[in-house]
Design a protein with these regions (language model features):
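Rossmann-like adenosine-cofactor binding region
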Residues: 2-71
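Adenosine-phosphate binding glycine-rich loop
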Residues: 45, 49-137
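Broad hydrophobic/π-residue packing in well-ordered secondary structure
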Residues: 1, 30-31, 99, 116
Length: 137
């Protein structure tokens, strides 16, 4: 448990944020180490990253072209172009990548799969019984 957001982000390999409101930046530029992947689902709190991250991806141009720093992105592309193999995505372990997830499930499924594949061998074995009955939450 972290009391300070900068402490949480500093040194992280992956940062996923799902906040709907942010009143400023979550962390200073120096908190984002080389090689970090930042996935802000609702795009709040990471605008400073727009100016120094190596690659920025989003669902589509229309979702982000109105962002304050859009014209200053170092390198931008639509996320689907990675899946279509028209863009290689990460080309080095040092690249800082920002992937704005505006609202299509493509991001969610892809990133969950990639993160899981990276850590699955270090996870403890957990057995779970499949639910066979419908339920309401």
């Amino acid at each position: 448990i972290f009391e300070n957001v900068e402490d949480l982000i500093t040194g992280a390999d992956v940062v996923v944020s799902c906040v709907t409101v942010a009143h400023g930046q979550f962390a200073s530029d120096t908190c984002f180490k080389s090689g970090v992947l930042v996935v802000p689902v609702h795009t709040r709190g990471f605008q400073n990253c727009d100016l120094f991250f190596d690659q920025i991806f989003a669902d589509d141009v229309a979702h982000v072209e109105g962002f304050k720093y859009f014209n200053q992105f170092k390198q931008f592309d639509e996320f689907a172009r990675i899946l279509l193999k028209q863009n290689p995505g990460r080309t080095s372990d040092q690249e800082r990548i920002l992937a704005y997830n505006i609202g299509i499930a493509l991001h969610d499924i892809y990133f969950a799969s990639q993160v899981y594949d990276k850590v699955k061998d270090s996870l403890p074995d957990i057995s779970s019984d499949k639910l066979s009955e419908k339920f309401w939450v």
